[in-house]
């Protein structure tokens, strides 16, 4: 672009042209003192079209020859005013950020330019600088490749869009750079960071923007994010900041980020809430590296038994470009989805140590030595670690192949594949024994009980990996994958152990059944939690629920339930008042969970350290369910408007109470929750103990003193009341 030769102290005019055709532009001059330029260009394909002219206040006709404009860049048009020098391309800031999608554009400061495309086009443009009064609007009408721009106020709404193949302006890069500048400026003001460190901060912040994004209802472990950052600094040979400073960097980029402590009791960790890894981030494949092995607290030199995902051709190149698609085939799409889901599971979990084998006074079977026993222990440990690896990588279908390999099954797997180990060494580590010797060892009672205990530990670890927090939002695709996995477990095990004795299969199947049932229950609980979360966040629904609950006749409920539950009336009244108060405070789901946890602690505290703790816990569940059903019954009879909300809340609270009680019982007995829930899975082997528990329960319910008092009352009370109190013999037998 060149200056006008006639430029002087008098007001001058400058005209711009964006057409590439040879037709001379129609120039409407404007005084430069008004700081406005009106450009009208007509392409060769639009010769017959009418030119739309926009009224511009205070425009004067100044006869002056204007030289033809020279283009410095095919994608930008710049202008100069008066005696100003020509701006070199690339030194001005964009006034408008562009996106090929429909986008609302905000006006920025600085010199303005508009993208022009090759080919025929009609453009009518008025560019206004800051000198224009507030009532002087800037109007733009374009017809480029079918796009239409509507001017309203200072915002420009584009319908349609330019051809993607011809447009090269990146909105994301400009918005990212703006975010970086803003974040660095905030850090310099708040933390007093020197200006010479801005380039270092820029690399750290850019890495955060490239790999993370905001997402509602999602959390990420704080330690995992910092480990990712340390790895990045190590690869780029940068000096990392400490964890506290890194937290400030994150909050400077992702405004409003919250911190929560999530996880099960005794294993909770701090999480950033509202941020997640981008699906195309290379950090999703960290489990393939030694850093991932170190995060799992295993030796770096330990070999990986089963590779979670095979490296795809050209993936190394695609990792460096966020614009490229990560997966192009169905197999790669599944792999990418699994990697994305791993942020919702606990990938830092390790397999706890197994208990020692107690042979007692049982002699070893013939042809079995202690060397064989120790070899079985080692092989089974390797087998369980391999199981944990494939579940942690969400490769559920490999469980079937693992079982077939260990139990020497010759049956084909459900997907037609036959092998999974990576080498012959892996086969030897997993199998370890011929089938005949393996059957003999599994029939040996101490070995059978030891493997049962190992299975309880393994499957409890798998539950804590897949569902670390039952109340945390989880994608429905991951939940469905876990439920399908649970549905297939028993069939896979039965197929893999076809040639084994039934007593061995039943022992293994009982634990697997408890594991599958736990996965189904926890995923259902998680689904209920997400549905109830929306109800508890709705103020109008909460007010309606409180109004309906105040109409319930709790005195009548207590009178009907007291005969069955025999609960202390003061305890029931306290729970009623606490429930109403918590509902009135419009508590969140996490606050309700804390309230339920406190209720369980208060009720079961008198039984701590007692042998009757498991029975007291089960009785509490029955009584809680009975009372809640009585309240729901009253709401139903009254046609309460909030009945649906109460029904959903009741289902969630009953299920969460079940979850809390089973963990309390496991803690009191020193067992895993899987072992507690699998206690009655194999009824045939536990019938004697069941009879003993029934006898003790009957003795507790009808002690000698109770029976004597009951007989005394029966002599003095009317016959009608005796019918309500006396327990029939058939009921006592049951």
UniProtKB/Swiss-Prot annotation:
Any one Gene Ontology BP term: cilium assembly
Keyword DNA-binding belongs to the record: yes
InterPro entries linked to this entry: DNA-bd_RFX (IPR003150), RFX-like (IPR039779), RFX1_trans_act (IPR007668), WH-like_DNA-bd_sf (IPR036388), WH_DNA-bd_sf (IPR036390)
Span list, region Disordered: 1-31, 694-722
Compositional bias ranges of the Basic and acidic residues kind: 706-722
Main location: nucleus
A single Gene Ontology CC term: nucleus
Compositional bias (Polar residues): 1-23
DNA-binding region range list: 204-279
A family per Pfam: RFX1_trans_act
GO molecular function annotations of the record: DNA-binding transcription factor activity; DNA-binding transcription factor activity, RNA polymerase II-specific; RNA polymerase II cis-regulatory region sequence-specific DNA binding
Position of the signal peptide: none
Localization per Swiss-Prot or TrEMBL: Nucleus; Cytoplasm
Family: Belongs to the RFX family.
General function of this protein: Transcription factor that acts as a key regulator of ciliogenesis. Specifically regulates expression of genes required for cilium assembly and function. Recognizes and binds the X-box, a regulatory motif with DNA sequence 5'-GTNRCC(0-3N)RGYAAC-3' present on promoters.
Subunit structure, interactors included: Homodimer. Heterodimer; heterodimerizes with other rfx proteins.
Name of protein: DNA-binding protein RFX2
Organism, as annotated: Danio rerio
Gene: rfx2
């Amino acid at each position: 672009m060149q200056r006008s030769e006639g430029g002087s102290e008098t007001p001058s005019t400058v005209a711009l042209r964006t057409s590439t055709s040879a037709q001379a532009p129609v120039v409407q001059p404007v005084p430069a003192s008004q700081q406005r330029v009106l450009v009208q260009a007509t392409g060769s394909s639009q010769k017959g079209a009418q030119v739309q002219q926009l009224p511009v206040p205070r425009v004067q006709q100044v006869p002056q020859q204007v030289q033809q404009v020279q283009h410095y860049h095919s994608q930008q048009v710049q202008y100069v005013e008066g005696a100003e020098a020509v701006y070199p391309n690339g030194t001005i800031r964009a006034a408008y950020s562009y996106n090929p999608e429909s986008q609302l554009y905000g006006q920025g400061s600085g010199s303005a330019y508009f993208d022009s495309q090759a080919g025929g086009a009609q453009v009518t443009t008025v560019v206004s600088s800051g000198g224009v009064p507030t009532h002087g609007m800037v109007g733009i009408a374009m017809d480029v490749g079918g796009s239409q721009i509507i001017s309203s106020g200072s915002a420009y709404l584009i319908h349609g869009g330019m051809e993607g193949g011809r447009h090269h302006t990146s909105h994301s890069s400009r918005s990212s750079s703006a975010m970086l500048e803003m974040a660095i400026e905030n850090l310099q003001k708040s933390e007093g960071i020197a200006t010479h460190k801005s380039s270092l901060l820029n690399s750290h912040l850019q890495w955060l923007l490239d790999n993370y994004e905001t997402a509602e209802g999602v959390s990420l472990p704080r330690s995992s994010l910092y480990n990712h950052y340390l790895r990045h600094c190590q690869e780029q040979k940068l000096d990392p900041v400490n964890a506290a400073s890194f937290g400030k960097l994150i909050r400077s980029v992702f405004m409003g980020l919250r911190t929560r402590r999530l996880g099960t009791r005794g294993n909770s960790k701090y999480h950033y809430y509202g941020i997640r890894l981008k699906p195309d981030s290379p950090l999703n494949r960290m489990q393939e590296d030694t850093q991932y092995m170190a995060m799992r607290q295993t030796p770096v030199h330990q070999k990986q038994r089963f590779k979670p995902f095979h490296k795809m051709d050209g993936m190394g190149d695609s990792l460096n470009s966020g614009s490229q698609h990560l997966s192009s085939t169905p197999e790669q799409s599944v792999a990418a989805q699994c990697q994305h889901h791993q942020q919702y599971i606990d990938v830092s979990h390790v397999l706890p140590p197994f208990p020692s084998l107690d042979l007692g006074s049982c002699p070893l079977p013939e042809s079995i030595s202690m060397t064989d026993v120790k070899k079985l222990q080692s092989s089974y440990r390797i087998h369980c670690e391999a199981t944990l690896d494939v579940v942690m990588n969400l490769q559920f279908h490999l469980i079937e192949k693992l079982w077939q390999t260990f139990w020497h099954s010759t049956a084909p797997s459900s997907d037609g594949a036959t092998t999974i180990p990576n080498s012959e060494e892996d086969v030897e580590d997993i199998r370890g024994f011929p089938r005949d010797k393996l059957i003999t060892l599994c029939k040996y009672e101490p070995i059978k009980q030891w493997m049962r205990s190992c299975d309880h530990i393994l499957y409890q670890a798998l539950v804590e990996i897949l569902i670390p927090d039952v109340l945390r939002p989880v994608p429905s695709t991951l939940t469905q994958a876990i439920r399908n996995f649970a549905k297939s477990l028993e069939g896979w095990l039965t197929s893999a152990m076809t040639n084994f004795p039934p007593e061995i299969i039943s022992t293994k199947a009982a634990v697997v059944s408890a594991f599958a049932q736990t996965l189904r229950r926890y995923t259902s609980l998680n689904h209920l939690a997400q549905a109830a979360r929306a109800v508890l966040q709705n103020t109008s629904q909460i007010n309606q629920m409180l109004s309906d609950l105040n109409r319930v006749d709790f005195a009548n409920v207590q009178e009907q339930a007291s005969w069955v539950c025999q609960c202390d009336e003061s305890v029931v009244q306290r729970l009623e008042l606490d429930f109403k108060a918590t509902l009135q405070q419009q508590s969140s789901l996490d606050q309700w969970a804390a309230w339920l946890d406190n209720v369980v602690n208060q009720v079961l505290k008198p039984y701590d350290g007692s042998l009757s703790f498991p029975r007291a816990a089960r009785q509490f569940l029955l009584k809680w369910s009975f009372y809640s059903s009585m309240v729901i019954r009253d709401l139903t009879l009254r046609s309460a408007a909030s009945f649906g909300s109460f029904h959903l809340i009741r289902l969630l609270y009953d299920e969460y109470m079940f979850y809390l009680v089973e963990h309390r019982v496991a803690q009191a007995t020193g067992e895993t929750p899987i072992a507690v829930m699998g206690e009655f899975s194999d009824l045939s082997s536990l019938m004697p103990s069941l009879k003993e528990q029934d006898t003790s329960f009957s003795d507790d319910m009808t002690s000698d003193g109770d029976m004597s008092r009951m007989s005394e009352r029966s002599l003095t009370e009317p016959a009608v009341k005796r019918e309500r109190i006396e327990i029939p013999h058939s009921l006592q037998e049951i």
